[in-house]
C-alpha cells in the first residue's frame, strides 16, 4: 500500500465517523448547541471543529438520562 491509499482509507474512515451519531475521540456531543462536537478538556479543538453528532432519536429531547458528556469515552 502506498501513502496515498493509506491516506484515502483514513479519509473515508473520517467521513464515515462524521456520518455516525458519535463525535471523534476526545470530543463530546453538545446537544444544546445544535449537536456540534465540542472538545473535552485537553483535546485539540481542531479535532472537533466542524463535526456534528446525531442523537439516536433526534425527535425526542434527551433529559439527563443519556447525557453524552457524562459517558466515559474509550
From Swiss-Prot:
Main location class: secreted
Stretches of the chain forming a coiled coil according to its record: none
PTM text: Contains 3 disulfide bonds.
Keywords: Disulfide bond, Secreted, Signal, Toxin
UniProt tissue specificity: Expressed by the venom gland.
Signal peptide: 1-22
GO molecular function per UniProt: toxin activity
Phosphoprotein found in the keyword field: no
GO cellular component, one term: extracellular region
Compartments, as annotated in UniProt: Secreted
Homology family: Belongs to the scoloptoxin-09 family.
Name of the molecule in the record: U-scoloptoxin(09)-Sm3a
Species of origin: Scolopendra morsitans
